[in-house]
UniProtKB/Swiss-Prot annotation:
GO molecular-function term, one example from the UniProt record: rRNA (cytosine-N4-)-methyltransferase activity
Function recorded in the entry: Specifically methylates the N4 position of cytidine in position 1402 (C1402) of 16S rRNA.
UniProt protein name: Ribosomal RNA small subunit methyltransferase H
Binding site for S-adenosyl-L-methionine: G32, G33, H34, D52, F78, D100, Q107
Biological process annotations from GO: rRNA base methylation
Known EC number: 2.1.1.199
This protein's UniProt keywords: Cytoplasm, Methyltransferase, rRNA processing, S-adenosyl-L-methionine, Transferase
Subcellular location: Cytoplasm
Signal peptide segment: none
Taxonomic source organism: Legionella pneumophila subsp. pneumophila (strain Philadelphia 1 / ATCC 33152 / DSM 7513)
Entry annotated with the keyword Methyltransferase: yes
Family: Belongs to the methyltransferase superfamily. RsmH family.
Pfam families reported in the protein's UniProt record: Methyltransf_5
Enzyme class: transferase
Length: 308
């Protein structure tokens, strides 16, 4: 089992420009790599609030961080960040928010969670095991058109229709209940394999995103972040595929442009009503980090700052 390694750890912490007495949110606790580093930069007066959908992560946080009075974790989605910030009484006073998107290594490496097409396990893929719908429900119950749409929209799978039909044909014989069973069906239906990529990669990603409503949650979270942050507060987001990064990039671009008038209206940049700016360029892992942790290879970090 791979050791959990926080991706772009130093770059994201630097991007948050942590104040010793500041208030911070780690929207994706995982196994606490980023949280631990944030706490290392805080004084006794600093506060860190963490969020995670996964009850295993929440329990880990309580076991390893529970005695730290600066720390508190909420069970739920980062799409509830405004609600949690309100409960904590810190709306509009937060100095930084970190989001490290996607599935965590402990989830991916545990066969029982059903995220991996390389490990035999139940077809589950729920980040939050308290939710009712899992991957098996979707794979065995969705119409062929819905399957194809999800594979195309969330996996950018070229052969979405062909794979969807193969799944529907297979489940007529018996329900599809395991990861390797699904992976084999996808593999056989995929006529052209990408170099250095398992043929089921895109389909598994698509199902995971759909089951966990990952992109919807991301959009909802980003829209709440500016209300949660105080003036000068930083937002740091690490994404792992183009769908996530596109949402983050577009959000930051739109917020930086503010209430932009029609092109024909002459107006200076300084006169635009905006309360957000991008900080620096997108950051990618160094080759040394990729060598040490191959899962970091597609990571992109984007940072922004609330102005007022």
């Amino acid at each position: 089992m791979a050791k959990h390694q926080s991706v772009l750890l130093h770059e994201s912490i630097k991007g948050l420009a942590i104040k010793a007495d500041g208030i911070y949110f780690d929207g994706t606790f995982g196994r606490g790599g980023h949280s631990r580093e944030i706490l290392n930069h805080l004084s006794d007066k600093g506060r860190l609030f963490a969020i995670d959908k996964d009850l295993d992560a929440v329990q880990y946080a309580k076991d390893y961080f529970g005695l730290d009075k600066r720390f508190q974790i909420f069970h739920g989605s980062f799409a509830q960040i405004k609600e949690f910030a309100s409960q904590a009484g810190v709306i509009g006073a937060v100095d930084g928010i970190l989001l490290d998107l996607g599935v965590s290594s402990p989830q991916l490496d545990n066969p029982e969670r059903g995220f991996s097409f390389m490990l035999q396990g139940p077809l589950d893929m729920r980040m939050d095991l308290t939710q009712s719908i899992n991957a098996a429900n979707f794979v065995n119950e969705a119409e062929v058109n819905e399957l194809a749409h999800v594979f195309r929209a969330y996996g950018e799978e070229r052969f979405a229709g062909r794979i969807a039909k193969a799944i529907v044909d297979a489940r007529k014989l018996k329900p599809i209940t395991t990861t390797l069973e699904l992976a084999e069906i996808v593999k056989e239906a995929n006529p052209k394999w990408e170099k250095h990529k398992h043929p089921a990669t895109r389909v598994f990603q698509a199902i995971r995103i759909h089951v966990n409503q990952e992109l919807t949650d991301l959009s909802n979270c980003l829209e709440q972040c500016l209300d949660v942050l105080g003036p000068g507060g930083r937002l740091a987001v690490i994404s792992f595929h183009s769908l996530e990064d596109r949402i983050v990039k577009q959000f930051m671009r739109d917020k930086e442009q503010g209430n932009r008038p029609p092109v024909e209206v002459p107006i200076k940049y300084e006169e635009l009503k905006t309360n957000f700016k991008k900080v620096g360029k997108a950051v990618k892992p160094q080759s040394s980090e990729i060598k040490e942790n191959v899962r970091s290879r597609s990571a992109v970090l984007r940072i922004g700052e609330k102005l007022a």
